[in-house]
Amino acid sequence: MEKLLIVNADDFGLCKGQNYGIIDAFRNGVVSSTTAMMNSVDINHAAELSAQYPALPVGMHFVLTFGRPLTAMPSLTDANGELGKWLWQRAGAGTLDLNEIAQELECQFERFSAVFGRPPTHIDSHHHVHMLPQIYPLVAAFAREKSLPLRIDRHEVQQHGLTLDNPRSSEWFNAGFYGENLSEPSFLQLLEHADQQGVNSLEIMCHPAFIDQTLMTSGYCYPRLTELAILTSPTLKPAIAQRGYRLGSFLDC
């Protein structure tokens, strides 16, 4: 039986280098889906590229840890009005304002529809914040309300004891294509691991990009260029097919 592989490029809209890298990996490689950051400075540029390449499915990358929110979020922003990774400290302290988060989720969704002219194909999140135990029920309910698939990290489900209410998703998600020691064989090992688990639909996260001044300030910079080289390798797509996978998106879930 042919299996589904979703190669989803996160961070669409982060900057032009990221946007161009994702499009290149879609046109000339194995990226089959992407998710957009609606509070990022180059989101309109991403939407322009999306209009040029409408075959690329675009979902929403819900953001609570980067940039400025679209709504007032005094409980999660610093003195400069910026979001940050202190979200986990607030979560650990039990001080998350879920009403603020729900309003921001709705606003990012509405902006997606306005900017891209259509709803997202699915929802995931920056730094996987939607898998936090306090936030997951909120985002899962929102996805069900909008009839949208949702990225589900089964490791996080087990770790936090989350209850899955039959969400539309891939059977498995793997965040392992990330870091300093990436290669084509390491990408293919993720498929082999999924096979060992008997998985018929797999999502792999990636961040292919060309380096620009914005990415030079990121803690995850040059590996994005390595990802792009691997994902556009002429031997990768045939190797995926040889392992019984077809490339697709959350529209196939």
Curated annotation (Swiss-Prot):
The keyword Magnesium applies. It is found in: Cytoplasm. Keywords: Carbohydrate metabolism, Chitin degradation, Cytoplasm, Hydrolase, Magnesium, Metal-binding, Polysaccharide degradation. CDD domains: YdjC_EF3048_like. Mg(2+) binds at residues 61, 126. Pfam families: YdjC. GO terms for biological process: chitin catabolic process; diacetylchitobiose catabolic process; polysaccharide catabolic process. It comes from the Bacteria. GO terms for molecular function: chitin disaccharide deacetylase activity; deacetylase activity; metal ion binding. Pathway: Glycan degradation; chitin degradation. Its cofactor is Mg(2+). InterPro entries: COD_ChbG_bac, Glyco_hydro/deAcase_b/a-brl, YdjC-like. It catalyses: N,N'-diacetylchitobiose + H2O = N-acetyl-beta-D-glucosaminyl-(1->4)-D-glucosamine + acetate; diacetylchitobiose-6'-phosphate + H2O = N'-monoacetylchitobiose-6'-phosphate + acetate. It is an enzyme of class 3 (hydrolase). GO terms for cellular component: cytoplasm. Its EC number is 3.5.1.105. Involved in the degradation of chitin. ChbG is essential for growth on the acetylated chitooligosaccharides chitobiose and chitotriose but is dispensable for growth on cellobiose and chitosan dimer, the deacetylated form of chitobiose. Deacetylation of chitobiose-6-P and chitotriose-6-P is necessary for both the activation of the chb promoter by the regulatory protein ChbR and the hydrolysis of phosphorylated beta-glucosides by the phospho-beta-glucosidase ChbF. Homodimer. Belongs to the YdjC deacetylase family. ChbG subfamily. This is Chitooligosaccharide deacetylase. It comes from Yersinia pestis.
